Amino acid sequence: MLWHNTIGSGPDLVLLHGWGFSSDIFETLVDKYKNQYRITLIDLPGHGRSDDVNGGINEWCNTIAELVPNNANVLGSSLGGLLAMKIASICRIKNLIVVGATPSLTCNDNWQYGMEVETFMKFADDLKQNYAKTLRRFVSLQTKDKTLMRRIFEIIDKYPPSSSALTQGLSILLETDYQELFKSLDIPKYTILGTLDM
């Protein structure tokens, strides 16, 4: 079962967090927008307070899709962005917003904007050796703000992801290429990238 919580009132906004985190990562966003939107927070499979879901991206997205209100705005961050792309293809949503996510995390012959596969595989190997240390290193790549970094570590430590969910999430990130799917979505799509995402 996936943990989810709905807060606020207004148009529906579903928030999908990234790899290794929980929906608590959105606490500042929720505080700011809960009076303008009815916000649905969902912990991804094996993350936060959610149980594991066996399988890959299709199984994860089918499970998440059951919690997405009709005509919702869906915002996904990183891995959550990739999942949001798939969910947009199986649910009726109003707008798709992806933050720090592209249709393919890794480079390939048709996509030059991702991470080199070798770099990704090194990260995956490090995860097998010491997932807590690797997750902390991953966070340190996201921000240099020490206060924010401490808060993110507190969120991760409060609800650590399962090792199987971390492995499944990395497999999804490595194997998924949604360039064609993303182009085919006939809804408004917004991509937000930071300096370190370029």
Model-derived segments and spans:
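Conserved alpha/beta-hydrolase catalytic His-Asp/Glu region
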Residues: 128-176, 180-181
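Conserved HGGG/HGGXW glycine-rich cap/lid loop of the alpha/beta-hydrolase fold
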Residues: 2-51
